[in-house]
């Protein structure tokens, strides 16, 4: 059994960073993804560098806050104030052909470059709100990832036993984006404990293992603070994730060999 437990949103707020690092030190998290567009991102990167057993990837952000690039250079990605568009508006622009691929590529490269400038080598990529799976974005992400030497891109294909509109949409997006990511390794299946709340005890972990292949469990642990409330709609659920991921019984259920890094 090989399961990867990844905590998203490192750097989104000081409280989120604290929760992720605690989930690593006391729990089953061995992988996290850094969002570089928040005010607390640089400090989060510095703290993560002090954890030698924590793999830090890039959490591409195209829907929150300000771009790393000069807003004037990525006009198709931002609103009149120079901020990223929300998910709904970005989706409309993407599927109406109003987002320039060159601007997408420039912003993604800028985010990876900024992470490296903070001492983080992000060889595993995923994204905020799974936007990297949207076909127009996936094509650009796949091309830039190859140029950057990325060794892992998250797929979000839910196991068939998980059903619902969100799971079906992510399964379809993963299928459509497969060609864009061809040749870049990734997980076979993905479960988000924040939204799906699978049973995570010995029996639940055994059920996940039965799906076979390399699976990824995504989570969003964190402590609630004002920066988080201002930046994201996912707030109180993060405390629940923190409790789940640091439960000693869960660590026992996983076993030391079950929780592996994504990037060899």
Locate the predicted segments by residue.
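Terminal accessory/targeting
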Residues: 1-4, 10, 14-124, 134-264
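Active-site histidine-anchored catalytic micro-motif
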Residues: 127-129
């Amino acid at each position: 059994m090989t399961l990867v437990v990844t905590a998203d949103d490192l750097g989104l707020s000081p409280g989120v960073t604290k929760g992720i690092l605690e989930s690593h030190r006391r729990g089953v998290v061995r992988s996290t993804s850094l969002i570089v567009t928040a005010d607390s991102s640089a400090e989060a990167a510095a703290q993560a560098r002090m954890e030698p057993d924590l793999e830090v990837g890039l959490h591409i952000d195209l829907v929150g806050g300000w771009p790393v690039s000069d807003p004037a250079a990525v006009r198709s990605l931002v609103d009149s104030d120079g901020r990223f568009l929300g998910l709904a508006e970005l989706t409309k622009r993407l599927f109406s052909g109003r987002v320039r691929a060159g601007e997408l590529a420039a912003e993604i490269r800028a985010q990876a470059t900024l992470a490296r400038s903070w001492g983080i080598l992000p060889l595993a990529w995923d994204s905020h709100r799974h936007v990297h799976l949207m076909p127009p974005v996936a094509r650009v992400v796949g091309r830039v990832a190859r140029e950057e030497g990325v060794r892992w891109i998250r797929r979000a294909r839910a196991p068939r036993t998980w059903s619902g509109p969100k799971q079906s949409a992510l399964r379809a997006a993963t299928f459509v984006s497969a060609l864009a990511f061809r040749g870049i390794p990734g997980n076979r299946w993905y479960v988000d404990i924040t939204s799906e709340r699978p049973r995570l005890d010995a029996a639940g972990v055994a059920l996940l293992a039965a799906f076979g292949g390399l699976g990824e469990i995504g989570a969003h642990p964190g402590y609630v603070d004002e920066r988080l409330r201002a930046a994201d709609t996912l707030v109180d659920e993060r405390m629940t994730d923190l409790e789940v991921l640091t439960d000693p019984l869960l660590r026992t259920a996983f076993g030391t060999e079950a929780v592996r890094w994504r990037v060899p």
